[in-house]
Amino acid sequence: MDKVTPRYNSGIQRSKGILELAAALYDTSLSRLVTRGGTAVPQINSRLGAGISLRLDTQMVTPTDGELALSFGVDGLRRNLMQVAEKQLSLVWVNPNASLALAYKGCAPFPGPLPLRAIAVFPSWDATVIAVHESTGITSLEQIRERRIPLRVTTRETIKPPFDEDATMFAVNTIINAAGFSLDDICAWGGSVQAVPRPSHPDRSDAIRKGAIDAIFDEGVLSWGQFALERGFRILPVEGAVRERVMAAGYDMITLTPGRIPGLKAPVSSVDFSGWPMIVHADMADDVAYALCEAIEARKLAIPTDNFRPLDLAQLCTIDEETPRGAPLHPGAERFYRERGYLRR
């Protein structure tokens, strides 16, 4: 008798097929190849949104035979991480690791320490920085408040404070508040704020090129840093009392170097925005966390990376400058990495 190739049951066939279809849509005519603003670096943009809310429900109203219902989310800050803590979401994948660190420590915008764990931290090196044009004469963050300088700022979409659903704006706000001012203060002093949806948006690079802005408050510094530095901008160090306040708020620091950002004249300290953690509840069953890691391994060639290198599972469970970890590994994930030889310590 010929060997029969097993296949998924009909319901799973449709569910799995929809997931494959959704992923493939980013490789269709709905997407287009562009370049990052002000650079020749290719980047794919799509008419499809980047937000996702996904539920894998059980096939029966009452789960049988150990069936699981899993739900997934991407990005966000307070709401999504709170939903994982409240077991309304099974997993959320966010940028950056700082969001997980704030939640695990119980720092604002969270009400207290949340029972969260990481199953993986995907590599991404980044920083949130405050950069100003040399023509402003500004060399420190405190000078902006002291001189009440009417800066023309470009930053991200400026949702209303306290910015607790936007990791970028929450970090920016933490830095400038630690220095004693806000975006509203800048506007009150006669300045202005340009909001762009992403760090490399062409509206920003055009404004830099035309001299229409003199300050940049954002992350994604690898996408715009060199371009801005070559046109007279400098990155202000987060140091002294400002640094202490930012770290007390739950953030870690990172050193930017000329090796990372061409055009930088000397190392400068700023706020770490590295790492993309996949986050689950501390109480998730070990076998489910283990299986999630198995799935990452099975699809490692298909999962995009931010560091332009093939996905390395050993890096996902190892703390380094691209993969800081704001909460411990889930025990099920740790067992997977040890058994497969990815985690040796």
Pin down the residues of each PLM region.
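Pocket-flanking alpha-helical
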Residues: D57-P111, P202-A207, E219-E230
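Residue-level signal for nonpolar/aromatic packing positions in well-ordered secondary structure
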Residues: V84, I130, I144, I208, ...
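Pocket-lining segment of extracytoplasmic ligand-binding domains
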Residues: P96-A98, G106-C107, T136, F181-I279, ...
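Extracytoplasmic
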Residues: E86, L114, W125-A127, R148, ...
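Segments of small-molecule ligand-sensing domains
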Residues: G263, P267-R345
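Sec-exported extracytoplasmic/periplasmic mature domains
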Residues: G49, L89, I149, N173, ...
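Bilobed "Venus flytrap"/periplasmic-binding protein-like clamshell domains
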Residues: T5-T62, E67-S71, D126-R204, P304, ...
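A structural signal for short loop-to-beta-strand junctions that line the ligand-binding cleft
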Residues: P111-T128, I261-S270
